[in-house]
């Protein structure tokens, strides 16, 4: 799928090899939107790589704010460009460390190495290195990056600025 869940699983396999299995847990959040075969493929991949203790699948979340709050790192592994990239914006607004592919909207919303990390789209090794970097950062650096991310989003996406930009387009 274009969301890159299979790429994420490949990257987590590499993270496990590097850091060990007790260093992290990952959640793949969101329903399969009728793509039952794809979800079964993801589950098989997780089993094949011995990641069933690290990766959990959650179909639906009623409280995304809480999901972000309990996360240390948020990953958007899209392999096709997203026009906006809502996950990256939401994660930054919640002061979370975001790791996203270097295509589409993420290039506009994330300042690499300052408000989050961008990895080479479609490259599991590149993604795994960013995840490892995020998992091994000290808490002060993670918090600072989160605050920078929130500040970045507030500057770029306040209502007044968005209205002016929209008005300017139609003018």
Predicted regions and their residues:
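Conserved acidic donor-binding segment of nucleotide-sugar-dependent glycosyltransferases
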Residues: 112-113, 117-124, 133-139
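Short hydrophobic beta-strand element within catalytic cores of glycosyltransferases
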Residues: 97-100, 110
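Acidic donor-binding loop of glycosyltransferase active sites
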Residues: 69-83, 96
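Active-site donor-binding acidic/aromatic loop of nucleotide-activated sugar
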Residues: 34-39, 52-61, 67, 117-118
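A conserved mid-protein helix/loop that constitutes part of the nucleotide-sugar donor-binding site
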Residues: 1-16, 40, 125
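Short acidic alpha-helix that forms the nucleotide-activated donor recognition element
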Residues: 57-71, 93, 111
